[in-house]
Regions:
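Short catalytic-loop micro-motif centered on adjacent basic/acidic residues
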Residues: 53-55, 76-79, 103-104
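Rossmann-fold NAD(P)-binding glycine/threonine-rich loop
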Residues: 67, 80-102, 109-123
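Active-site-lining helix/loop region of Rossmann-like oxidoreductase modules
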Residues: 9-26, 30, 48, 123-169
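Short, Lys/Arg-enriched N-terminal segments with co-localized hydrophobic residues
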Residues: 1-8
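A short helix->loop->beta-strand "cap" motif at the edges of active sites that frequently abuts
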Residues: 72-75, 97-99
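Short acidic low-complexity segments
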Residues: 36-50
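Beta-loop-alpha module in the N-terminal Rossmann-like domain of NAD(P)-dependent dehydrogenases
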Residues: 48-71, 82-87
Length: 169
């Protein structure tokens, strides 16, 4: 599917690791234009012609990247994990500025179905004799964040659904 010229977007990519490179390939195949690629320090003036920023950088950089984009009036889709404690502040700034900000720890349809199933099962199993939820995460050796954002989300959803679980470790 290739968008018509009126649907094509001018994109900025912040973070050009494996995921950023995949996003770039897909965006170009779909007819979008990459206006900026940043893999470190960047200037908000480079967002002048950008409709949307896609951010897959590092946890220590994500908050600054997202807030710079929002202050520049550019919508942000962020998939960087590991900065959960600062996401509420980014959401607050977004609301104050009337901006657009979407965060997800995982964009896979299958994993998002897993999130829903995890919550649904935990709610129904809570209180059942012998129900003792346990998570174990296994990744390839090049995985940068551990635990992953996906594992954290699964654990947080279990904590919300199961009364006797107060925290994860």
């Amino acid at each position: 599917i290739v968008p018509s010229n009126e649907l094509a977007m001018n994109l900025a990519l912040i973070g050009h690791g494996k995921m950023g490179q995949q996003v770039e390939r897909c965006a170009l195949e779909l007819g979008h234009s990459i206006q900026m690629i940043a893999n470190g320090q960047w200037d908000s003036a480079s967002l002048k012609r950008v409709d949307l920023t896609i951010e897959f950088s590092r946890p220590e950089a994500a908050f600054e990247n997202v807030t710079k984009c929002l202050r520049a009036g550019v919508a942000v889709v962020c998939g960087t994990t590991g900065w959960n404690d600062k996401i509420p502040a980014a959401e607050k700034l977004c609301k104050e500025l009337g901006g657009s900000f979407l965060f997800a720890s995982n964009f896979s349809i299958g994993v998002n179905l897993l999130f829903a199933l995890n919550k649904w099962l935990a709610e129904r199993m809570d209180g059942q004799a012998g129900f003792a939820p346990e998570l174990e995460e296994i990744h390839h050796e090049h995985k940068l964040d551990a635990p992953s954002g996906t594992a954290i989300r699964l654990a947080e959803d279990l904590i919300q659904a199961v009364d006797r679980i107060g925290q994860w470790k």
